[in-house]
């Protein structure tokens, strides 16, 4: 079966509207999990206010800001940064794992029970979390060097969670296979990832102009919208990999 962008776009559109309720629920659940973890973190409010009130133009301004901190403030900033990274990874892994399980359950001819699906999710979660950590770290290094390497790494690593789920491979094998397949089909996978990135950018720009809306409400809308956008990307990539396995 030939793989085309139009075919994948049509299948993604069809699946999204067919399971729109479940996708919205998962997106909202992941957002509230994010909020719940944020409540438990309880950071030093002095550090949070400093971070929110300072606009860092580049890495040097951030480094200068950190150098002017005392030892206790540096410790609190490090702790806060690590906890926020963990929060983001847990939320992303929950969303990613849930959407992958949802698509696999719908795609299988033999329907699985809810208990079986939840069990599969919890078995899949630890390895997916580690994979997310590795790929996020690699992609961020790419963005630190230049924007183009970051975008390219985002594209070629995008299939790794789906390969991990399908093949039950080791983490590094999933990354390696993702790089090989994504590079080979970059003209098909690239548009999906770029659409997601552009969607995130446009959404961020639009929501930045809604200054009259309550900050917490804006955070909620932003997170749910971002989660839905990411879910669409996962559906697109999952469908690609299903067709790829059959071809």
Swiss-Prot record:
Name where it's found: Cell membrane
Origin superkingdom: Bacteria
Kindly state which keywords UniProt assigns to this record, in alphabetical order. Answer: Cell membrane, Membrane, Transmembrane, Transmembrane helix
Q: How does it sit in the membrane?
A: Multi-pass membrane protein
- The regions listed as transmembrane in this protein's record are 20-40, 85-105, 114-134, 137-157, 188-208, 218-238
Pfam families the UniProt entry points to? UPF0259
Q: Name one GO cellular component term.
A: plasma membrane
Q: What is its main location?
A: membrane
UniProt record similarity statement = Belongs to the UPF0259 family.
The name under which this protein is listed is UPF0259 membrane protein BUAP5A_271
Q: Which organism is it from?
A: Buchnera aphidicola subsp. Acyrthosiphon pisum (strain 5A)
């Amino acid at each position: 079966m030939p793989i085309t962008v139009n075919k994948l776009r049509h299948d993604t559109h069809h699946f999204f509207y067919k399971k729109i309720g479940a996708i919205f629920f998962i997106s909202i659940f992941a957002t509230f999990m994010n909020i719940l973890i944020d409540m438990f973190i309880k950071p030093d409010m002095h550090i949070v206010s400093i971070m929110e009130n300072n606009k860092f133009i580049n890495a040097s301004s951030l480094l200068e800001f950190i150098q002017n901190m005392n030892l206790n403030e540096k410790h609190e900033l490090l702790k806060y940064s690590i906890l926020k990274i963990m929060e983001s990874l847990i939320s992303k892994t929950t969303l990613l794992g849930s959407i992958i399980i949802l698509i696999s359950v719908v795609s299988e001819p033999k329907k699985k029970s809810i208990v079986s699906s939840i069990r599969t999710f919890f078995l899949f979660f630890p390895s997916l979390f580690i994979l997310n950590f590795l790929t996020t770290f690699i992609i961020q290094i790419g963005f630190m060097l230049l924007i183009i390497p970051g975008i390219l790494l985002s594209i070629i690593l995008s299939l790794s969670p789906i390969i991990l789920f399908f093949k039950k491979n080791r983490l590094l094998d999933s990354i390696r296979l993702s790089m090989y397949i994504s590079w080979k089909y970059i003209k098909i996978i690239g548009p999906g990832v770029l659409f997601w990135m552009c969607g995130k950018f446009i959404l961020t720009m639009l929501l930045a102009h809604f200054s009259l809306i309550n900050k917490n409400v804006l955070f909620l809308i932003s997170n749910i919208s971002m989660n839905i956008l990411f879910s669409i990307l996962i559906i697109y990539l999952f469908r690609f990999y299903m067709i790829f396995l059959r071809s």
